[in-house]
Amino acid sequence: MDYTVVWLAAGISFLVTLVLGPVTIPLLQRLKFGQTIRAEGPAAHMAKTGTPTMGGIMFLIGIAVAGAVLLVSNIPGRAEGLVVLAVTLGYGLIGFLDDFIKVVLKRNLGLKAREKILGQLVFATVLAVVAVFKLGRGTDYIIPFSSGISFDLGWWPFFFLTLFVLLGTSNGVNLTDGLDGLASGATVFTATAFAILALVTGKIGLAIVLAAVVGGCLGFLFYNRHPAKVFMGDTGSLALGGALGAGAVVTRNELLLVVIGGLYVLETLSVIIQVISFKTTGRRVFRMSPLHHHFELSGWSERKVVRNFWLLSFLFSLVGLLGAQDFWLWLSNR
């Protein structure tokens, strides 16, 4: 099978994102779309105040262009690719509205929690319905690290689990996006793992979209690595989470997402544990949550935290990939 088109998708998204940087970043600066830094955060972060945000629009355009160019033909997995692309852009739109309200309308909290969750639920519902009734995905789940053992939950449990997967992943990536290059770099590994799973199951169209996510994140890293010239904002983090969650649902690897996206799980758990501990005992388990801030306040430099968390994301993705039955079936047929 010729995978050239998948590499091309990553390349197009990478180049579009890279080219948009010198145009988008000065525009965001002129519009004064600057990031507000929490006073209770690490003191070193105060220097980031005013750094342009909403930069996620750069790689969203790159992903959309790659998808528009390469998903026109009737390739295997085209429908799956279009669905994941739609969810990615939909979640990006929710993030954009949230950023716009915070940065432009100066409403610090952005969209109300119920408004943001409602928007995410709408796209998650569409994904669940389309996956089962249009893509023939079924309502069964493959148990990771097994010989392909699966179990069928039926429609309603599948529906609610899909909602949970999309909301959990998008907000997990959002929580991870707290250091220069952390979320964009970690997503390179996570999205690569799901792109490989799409390829080995013959879903080239889906692999194209996920490869475009990888390319867009790599292009964005040129401007987002420390010291960051731009932040992705909720525009980018919610979109990336939507892409990963939707990719997991379409490839029937929702359970494996817990492993492949293990870094996001750790970041989210650190927040949950911190809140529960403080409310029940008045004590904090971590110096600060999410987890990356704990290591910063423990004396690690921002670069060191990011490098180690990238490595952790790579290892989670590798272990998760090795736990996928589809991957081993593909290897055995080579």
UniProtKB/Swiss-Prot annotation:
Catalytic activity: UDP-N-acetyl-alpha-D-muramoyl-L-alanyl-gamma-D-glutamyl-meso-2,6-diaminopimeloyl-D-alanyl-D-alanine + di-trans,octa-cis-undecaprenyl phosphate = di-trans,octa-cis-undecaprenyl diphospho-N-acetyl-alpha-D-muramoyl-L-alanyl-D-glutamyl-meso-2,6-diaminopimeloyl-D-alanyl-D-alanine + UMP
The EC number(s) this enzyme carries: 2.7.8.13
Membrane topology: Multi-pass membrane protein
Pathway(s) served: Cell wall biogenesis; peptidoglycan biosynthesis
Transmembrane feature ranges: 5-25, 52-72, 81-101, 116-136, 148-168, 181-200, 230-250, 256-276, 309-329
Cofactor annotation: Mg(2+)
MF GO annotations: metal ion binding; phospho-N-acetylmuramoyl-pentapeptide-transferase activity; UDP-N-acetylmuramoyl-L-alanyl-D-glutamyl-meso-2,6-diaminopimelyl-D-alanyl-D-alanine:undecaprenyl-phosphate transferase activity
Subcellular location: Cell membrane
Biological process annotations from GO: cell division; cell wall organization; peptidoglycan biosynthetic process; regulation of cell shape
Family the UniProt entry places it in: Belongs to the glycosyltransferase 4 family. MraY subfamily.
Protein role: Catalyzes the initial step of the lipid cycle reactions in the biosynthesis of the cell wall peptidoglycan: transfers peptidoglycan precursor phospho-MurNAc-pentapeptide from UDP-MurNAc-pentapeptide onto the lipid carrier undecaprenyl phosphate, yielding undecaprenyl-pyrophosphoryl-MurNAc-pentapeptide, known as lipid I.
Protein name: Phospho-N-acetylmuramoyl-pentapeptide-transferase
